[in-house]
Design a protein with these regions (language model features):
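Single conserved hydrophobic/aromatic residue that forms the stacking wall/gate
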Residues: 1-10
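Short, surface-exposed loop/turn motifs that are enriched in glycine and acidic residues
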Residues: 4, 33-44
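Conserved active-site loop region of the serine DD-peptidase/beta-lactamase
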Residues: 11-12, 70
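Conserved ATP-utilizing enzyme core subdomain
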Residues: 14-16
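C-terminal ends of transmembrane alpha-helices
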Residues: 18-23
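Short linear capping/connector segments at secondary-structure termini
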Residues: 26-33
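CBM-like carbohydrate-recognition segments
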Residues: 39, 43, 48-130
Length: 130
């Protein structure tokens, strides 16, 4: 049942409707219109990885590649360099249950392991379908 629910969520393009012009998704996905909300890289990486994996496994058709590529490019554009170090910024530190205000005021980090792991997973999945 869970697999079918995940497929339906992606196939009905509900998540894709909230993809920003930049290609990434907001910390609170459905509130991109609020200036206090911000584009978050770890969730964006995981959404792109999920799209690519679903395409690779035949669960989604190739028309979804444009959304995956747009998300990938949005994340890549957001990266910075400090000397020889790649910086993955805009990563929410930790999670927890809270209201909207709680989520948009979560600490933001660079190179937090949640973000680095999600970035590596995204790159691996993208490499297999791009």
């Amino acid at each position: 049942l869970r697999r079918r629910q995940r497929q339906m969520c992606i196939r009905d393009r509900s998540l894709l409707a909230f993809q920003s012009e930049d290609g990434r998704w907001y910390q609170v996905v459905n509130r991109g219109d609020d200036p206090a909300n911000w584009l978050e890289n770890s969730c964006s990486c995981l959404y792109v990885a999920a799209l690519c994996k679903a395409i690779r496994k035949g669960l989604l058709d190739a028309s979804y590649l444009e959304y995956a590529r747009k998300g990938y490019e949005g994340v890549i554009r957001s990266l910075t360099w400090e000397d020889d170090d790649l910086i993955i910024g805009n990563v929410c530190i930790g999670t927890g249950v809270g209201d909207y205000d709680h989520y948009i005021h979560r600490p933001v980090s660079a190179n937090d392991l949640h973000g680095v792991g999600a970035f590596l997973l995204m790159c691996e999945e993208c490499e297999q379908v791009f």
